Design a protein with these regions (language model features):
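Solvent-exposed soluble domains appended to multi-pass membrane proteins
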Residues: 1-157
Length: 157
């Protein structure tokens, strides 16, 4: 594809859906690790160099691309650019919501909260009130946006 006309004007995003549940690696064979995936941004001009260990998720792809392109107009997204330092991820599995931040992992089942410092959820830590507030507001914003069909801007291009 390097010989295609569009190649030099394309940003490629390579990622995965989730890890295999049959993984033998202890870092991935757990409730958090199974959602750990690589995310690679590539451009032919090599402007996207380096490696980052920030916590990201699929909802960060669009804001990241808009950031790289220098897009400044308003847009709707639950994610953030991976090129910012504010890193977090949220996922839901059955009744369990999980917020992953640099401070740890916050589990939420039926409004009961527990926090852990490790991906295998063995080392409990004190709940971070800021993380609880963030997770509650995210869930509320997401639910209301879905219920009232507000997952769009009223802004016209």
């Amino acid at each position: 594809i390097k010989n295609e006309k569009w190649f030099n004007n394309t940003i490629f995003v390579i990622t995965a859906d989730h890890t295999s549940p049959k993984s033998v690696d202890k870092n991935y064979k757990n409730k958090i690790g199974r959602y750990s995936i690589p995310m690679l941004f590539y451009s032919a001009d090599n402007t996207l160099k380096g490696q980052s260990n920030v916590i990201t998720q699929h909802i960060d792809i669009m804001p990241s691309l808009l950031d790289v392109l220098g897009y400044k107009k308003p847009y709707f997204s639950f994610g953030e650019s991976v090129f910012y330092k504010n890193s977090w991820a949220i996922h839901k599995n059955n009744k369990r919501y999980c917020l992953i931040t640099e401070k740890g992992i916050l589990n939420n089942i039926d409004e009961n909260y527990s926090s852990f410092s490790d991906w295998r959820l063995k080392n409990r830590i004190e709940n971070d009130k800021g993380n609880i507030k963030f997770l509650k507001s995210f869930k509320q914003h997401y639910s209301k946006s879905m219920i009232y069909n507000h997952i769009k801007l009223k802004y016209e291009l």
